[in-house]
Structures are given as C-alpha cells and as structure tokens.
Amino acid sequence: KLYLMSQIDHSLSLASPVPRNFNAVQRIGLASVGAGLALLTVAIFGAAAAREGSFFWGAITLISLGGIAFSWSTYMQEAAGIKNNGVMFFSETARGALGWVFGVIITTFYILLYFYPAELGYSADGNTGLVALFDPLSYLLKGTPASQWFMYGTFYTLSILILGFKYILKYRHSRYHIIRTSSVMFFQTAFAFLIPEFMARLNQTAELKEAGMTVPYYDFKNVWPLNYYNFEGYRIDTMTDPTFNSLTNNLGFIMLLVGVGSVFFLSPLLTYFFGKRWYCSWVCGCGGLAETAGDPFRHLSDKSLKAWRIERWLIHSVLVFIVIMTIASVYAYLRDNGADYWINADVFVGMVATTLLGLTIALWTRRKLFATVQTDIKVVASILMVAITGLTVYTHLFGENGLVFFAQPYKIYSLYAFLIGAVFSGVIGVGFYPLMGSRVWCRFGCPMAAILGLQQRFFSRFRITTNGGQCISCGNCSTYCEMGIDVRAYAQRGQNIVRASCVGCGVCAAVCPRGVLSLENGPNTDNSRMDEVRF
C-alpha cells in the first residue's frame, strides 16, 4: 500500500508557512501599486507623456492608495497582534531568489543615484526620464526643476509614509509603536523633506539672486556626525555672512546655532534621559526607513559573536574616521579665517587636545564606570586619541603647504563622502536590506549611532529590564532584534540590558509572549549599572 508522504503535513505549527490566497481588496491594492510602478517604468524610458503633471500624480496616487488598501485588508481583517507568519519561508524575506533580486535592484538604483544620475534622467540642461517625472512637484515646492536628490527624497518620504501606515496597523495594539512610528513619519516629512525644500525656495528671491547667495540644504534634525558636511568652510561662510543673515532674518545664525547646540547640548541631554532611541528610532530618517520599509527583514540580522565583533570594531573605526575628517576640515578653515572668529586655530587645537587627552585619562582613572571595557579596547582607544592629538598639534606647529594630517583636507573629506556617505550608508546600507537586515548602516557604520551608543552605554538612564522568571526561552526577542542583540541570553539570566547598539525600537518587548521585557529609565549610578551592563 503506497502513501503519498508529500501530502502529509507533520508540522505542529499553527501558522502555515504557505502564504494564503489574497482577497479581492489585496489583489486590487497590489494591482494599483503595480500600475503606479508601471508608470514609473515608462518614465525611465523617457516617454514624453511622463513630463505631464497628471502622469506624476497618477503614479503617486496609484502607489499610495494601493499600499494603503493592501495594508488595511491585510491587518484589519484579523485581531490585533503581531503576526509574522511565513516570514522565514517567503522568498523575498528569507534570502531567497526574490530577496536577492530585490537586493540587486535596490543596490543598482543607489549606484545610479550616487554615481550616474544622468542615467536616471538628471541634466542641468533639462531633465528627462525618471527625474523629469518629479519636475511638477519640485516646481510646486521650490520653484526649480527636480534633481536626482529631490526624486530620491520624494521616494524616501513616500516609502516611510505608506509603509509606516502599514507598520502602525501591524502594531496597532502597542501605543509605544504607534507614537514612535508617527514620530519618524512626521520628522521625515516635515524636517527632512518639506522644510528644506521651502528653504530652497528662498533662493528664488530677487535679493539673494542679486547678492549671489544661496540657502544651503539643511535638515534641522540631522546632527553631526551624521551630517558630516555641516561644518565645511563654504557652509560656515554662508551661515555667518552678515549679508546673508540680513536677507534671511538670521537664518544662517539659526542653522549654525542648531548645528552646534544639537551636538554639545541637545543630543547628550536627551540621550541621558531616553537613550539613543530618542534619535535612532524616533527622529532619524535612516532609522525611519529601517523601521518601516525594513520591518519585514529585521529577522535577517546576524546574531553571531563574530558579527558582534565586526560591528564593534567597524562602527567605531568609522567614528574615528569622521573625527579626523572633521578636525581637518575645521582646523583648515580656522587657520585661514580664524581672525574673523573668537575661536581661532590656536584655541581649536587646545580644545581638541584637552578633550581627547581628558577622555584618555578618564578611561583609565574612572575604573568603576569603565570596568567592563576590555583592556585591549582601552589600549587601542588611548593610542588613537593620543595619536590624533599629537598629529593635530604637529600640524598646527609644523604643518606646511596647507596639509592637515599630511593630506589636503578636501581629499580626506572626499574620501569619507565616497566610502561612508555614499557606498556604506546608501548602496550597502539600504541595498542589503533583503540580505543582512534593515539596520546594516545603523549597526555597522553610522557614526551618530556610535556616539549615542557610547553615551547610552555609560551615561544614560535607559535600559531594557527583564523578568527572568517568566522567560520561556522561545527566542522571539532575539529573532526580531534588528541590531543583532541576543536578547534571550539576557532574559534567561534575568539581566537588564544596557547595550551600546540597542536603538530602543521596542519590538523585542512587543513580540515577547510573557511580558518579560520592558523599556524603562532607571537610576544612573556606577554600582546599580555594573551587574546589568554588557558592551
């Protein structure tokens, strides 16, 4: 007697890995999104009709309404609660063929965006192709033709809004996730997209045109070192120019004040009270895209010890790189223009030396605070800080021919902009979502995350508390940690979690079936934190 074993399901899972058939609303939603993408594809090949405003608004409307309809029908037909059914089996979310194809498409788009914008249709003599499709919206907001960056900003914002709506429906039972997602949607739309474009419209005023000045792009929520370009000489010249400020109601001084104040006051203060989550999960555009568009891929983050070691050294290497680049840029500017400011090159070198040597001394004398930092890390950090200090002083005393750190400052800046600002944060950071998870850039390369992580690690009240007695070791928390933290290992020991890499997204607590984890603020004393900290 023959048995067809392939027809017998031996699984005890209540959730079938085989995707269900889509209902009518879902099919209509997918068809609408497909039609919108088809219009974008037509625009890529330079169809004349693509330059019509109706073509652009039609594509955006079809994609938006289709995404909303599909999300609503997917999540609102069932009871509230996180459902990741089949995510480990679907080809697009399990590093299958569709996942690789999706990754290649995104990576190719970013390569064209950063290095070959003409292939997307951007031209100073008149846009064509895909970029030309966005001219109507660009004229509406700032009165000039679209650039590849305007096109990208529109795509980026639209993705966060549509998929943020989907995320809210999925996590609608969690007040924390609703508010957090609404926050990143607001900051991306208002601060990263609309306000900079409205500011760019000032460039069309007769006064600024007559003065030959332009308002530099400025995203008020971007904080150094994420906006590594903010303290470049040309921007400082514009922000401190009396004529520019008189024509823009002191906009330049406001931008400079926000840029400096956010680095030295706002960011450390908020990180002390709330941890790095205030920025990485509530404000940052990179984090916003990772939490919304990247949500289906969060389980792909590598949880291995090897990945953690690479992460630790790589992200802090990027931080060292941008510190060197910023010191070189600011010093070169003050060396040539220091007479115009109370902070001249002498004062700046003194500030750098005092800060870095002070941190080096504290690393070895504040034993309770830095007790869990391994000796090899202390040694490497000390050598780097002393070396940077020595090179800065040497450059100031003996440097010649405009060199800083034995190189032209603009070359250091260009190298960072290419390797980190373009390749790492863009091409790899987003293009590898379907392969390495949604926080590749945030975990391995973002210098802002590195600085906030160090503050969170040693000086913040934020931690994830655990009730180990309730843990059943299901592993959901570790599986869906997009930063690759083995949360379960802490929960099993009943050990509170204070990790430099944790962005406080709260998904580990949301997927826990026993309520073991809780995001809290606690006392910040050396003795109370030592038993709960793991670097």
Predicted regions: what is each one?
Residues K1-Q495, A500, G515-F535:
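Non-ligating segments of multi-cofactor redox enzymes
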